[in-house]
Amino acid sequence: RRALKPQGLLLFSTFGPETLWELRSAFAHADAAPHVSPFVDIAGIGDALVNAGFFQPVVDREEEVTHYPNLPALMHELRALGATNALRSRRTTLTGRSRFAAASTAYETHRAAAGLPATWEIVSAMAWAPEPGAPIREGGADLVAVPVSKIPIRRRG
């Protein structure tokens, strides 16, 4: 809210929770550690915008599916995009050949004629910035922000 002028338009896109669900599922068969970062769902994004005081939010989603010849090709593209696992709870050691082979075998169950699918859920949102001093909402209630300089000092005396 500090960077956007009052009644300015906020536009953004991000990934949704269905992004790379096939990869997440495949690695879940091979390893208990998470391998795909989680993303906020469309309702959570809308709620966050409203709670931050933005008005008239519009949130939409679409899915795009790309296909790869094999799991290493997908992993190579993810690394090239910089989309590696950023989770703190991720495994810090190498995945290892046996785990990677188990994930690859599990991923093969999703194979289509075009190759291994990778789903990308794209969530797009827009909302209008609130007026200066508009309340921030949390848990359905307005939070009041009062600058310290505006708090009167009562002196005993």
Where are these regions (language model features)?
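Conserved catalytic/acceptor-binding region of the Class I
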Residues: 5-71, 81-94
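C-terminal lobe and adjacent flexible extensions of AdoMet/dcAdoMet transferase-like proteins
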Residues: 72-157
